[in-house]
Amino acid sequence: MEYNDILIAPVLTEKSTELREQGKYVFKVAPKATKIQIKEAVRRLFNVKVTDCTVVNVRGKTKRLRYKEGKTSSWKKATVKLAKGETIKIFEGA
């Protein structure tokens, strides 16, 4: 799996913005990606040192549209903690 295929998108929410102050960054990642692959992808793509990585599988929610019920897709969320003093520039401009 390529490094660009592992990290799909950054997660920009109020909670993830607060975590940034602690040196933690949140990404939407590929469903089959492992913690080791995620750490390596962040290290290679952003040239930072990763100290910790936690992963959560987010279940899809049931939604209704008029008379039909549907379900949003499930996805995988990774929270990556960087070494002290390290930052990812792409988040600082957001």
UniProtKB/Swiss-Prot annotation:
Keyword Lyase annotated: no
Keyword Ribonucleoprotein: yes
Domain of life: Bacteria
A cellular component annotation (GO) from this entry: ribonucleoprotein complex
Function: One of the early assembly proteins it binds 23S rRNA. One of the proteins that surrounds the polypeptide exit tunnel on the outside of the ribosome. Forms the main docking site for trigger factor binding to the ribosome.
Subunit-structure text: Part of the 50S ribosomal subunit. Contacts protein L29, and trigger factor when it is bound to the ribosome.
Protein name: Large ribosomal subunit protein uL23
Lineage: Bacteria, Pseudomonadati, Spirochaetota, Spirochaetia, Spirochaetales
